[in-house]
Every structure is written in C-alpha cells, then in structure tokens.
Amino acid sequence: FYRI
C-alpha cells in the first residue's frame, strides 16, 4: 500500500 501507499502511505497508510
């Protein structure tokens, strides 16, 4: 994921 991206920047969770």
Curated annotation (Swiss-Prot):
It is found in: Secreted. Its main location: secreted. The modification 3-phenyllactic acid is found at residue 1. GO terms for cellular component: extracellular region. Coiled coil: none annotated. Neuron specific. Keywords: Amidation, Neuropeptide, Secreted. One of its GO terms (biological process) is neuropeptide signaling pathway. The modification Isoleucine amide is found at residue 4. Inhibits spontaneous contractions in several muscle groups. May be involved in the expansion phase of feeding behavior in sea anemones. This is Antho-RIamide-1. It comes from Anthopleura elegantissima (Green aggregating anemone).
